[in-house]
């Protein structure tokens, strides 16, 4: 039976159905906004206490039913109800209602005709865990031989939920489900299904059951809690909510990193290793604690193998200018791949010009995968160093790093692994990989800019002369001779970037608390969903379709320049990179000069991907002007 819904008096600043983001708003976002407006209006808990009603034919409340003062700012910015909602949004709201009585009260005070379940009224099959509890992350899905790589084809999703609901367990880690959903939350979802007449655009038939494309797999974190950890995600760009899809360029920073930097400057700021006062001790302790955090993150054998640098670019240059200059000569060979960022090409070109060594390049196939057969043909006794990326910044391809390293070592070559694009997506174990050097930048893994890491095997670092000279890296200086400190100090000349090293330590600790296995599983599903959405757009060509890839969705759209697409998306609040991504050789391998590159992180959502796809479709059909 169709219910008759009365009209609602006009409320200032409510979005209309013509708003491009109208269909992208989840119920969770709606209720969060309502709660914020209640708090801004100064409504007490008593005023907003729920009054459960059982009305056979619920109707929309009039403005007089709103438990807030009637002023233009009291309920401003409340988004209009969406015209469709997916299983994920409904499950998130149901879980939030059960876990947050304040949120339930806010919903009930605004929409009194909705009867919300409470945790006390629902039979409990298992306790509802906290919304953010990384320690309960289930066992990871099957993993490819490469460390931390989860292949697309190894994450099956059954067509129906299990009889016990959607609770994830270590013994059943491939089921459909939403994080920690159990029977209690399932009952709440059913209650929400039966009360949707307060949203006139919604019908129970328009809401899918708890199966489908948005299964969360073995994910063990609450995406909305994660997003609340990143203040910048609340920003608006051109009047739209910020959608940050430029994560391959840089990642956003969680509040814990911002707070750690602030604490350092307020309570610990000093130079390190060279004073007897209290602040110097605090600063030194914080700096060296960050080094230990990096060691733990990479599973290095010792903190003496961890060198702080400005970033990946400086780390590669350090190896090329120090170890390379000491060990390469005319006739020797350096091997890189077509996938490399310019920062892993130019230093080796310069070294080749200086020493007479030859630069060899491993080709890739039409999917963007390294040709291992061709790589083996390039290796010989002349090969002195192989330097390659673990994840392509332009295509997202995950290279078979362990195999590449093992083959190089058979010929006595050293190996540098560029982890700039891998550390935020995959668990890295430098001892298991057996790489000689591993490099990455802090800002790519939710840390500050201007700080990075060079990991090197201790025997290599000890045998390498420093690239730069100055204070902090010497043991003794006379006019006749200088004795250098052992590694890592010998490579950290001058006053280092102390505060940002401390901030990097906080970022890595944050990532490890969530768990890179959980992050990889969630991002895998984002990538699958995004690939499916973009593949359906007429004229769109995805660039880089390797079966093992990280969260990059480079594409071109027939008839439109990448730069124009990037500008149009920016007007919709969507940040992507449009250009050559400092990787011109690999784009030219595909006959291109530039692409549009959406790149994902674990704070992105399925709804954001749908917003992106909808905007691209509007560009393609001409309804979104360039």
Curated annotation (Swiss-Prot):
One Pfam family cited in the UniProt record for this chain: Aminotran_5
Protein name: Cysteine desulfurase
EC numbers on record: 2.8.1.7
Gene Ontology CC: encapsulin nanocompartment
Source organism per UniProt: Synechococcus elongatus (strain ATCC 33912 / PCC 7942 / FACHB-805)
Subunit note: There are 1-2 copies of this protein in each type 2A encapsulin shell.
Family stated for the protein in its record: Belongs to the class-V pyridoxal-phosphate-dependent aminotransferase family. Csd subfamily.
Record's subcellular location: Encapsulin nanocompartment
Entry function: Cargo protein of a type 2A encapsulin nanocompartment probably involved in sulfur metabolism. Cysteine desulfurases mobilize the sulfur from L-cysteine to yield L-alanine, an essential step in sulfur metabolism for biosynthesis of a variety of sulfur-containing biomolecules.
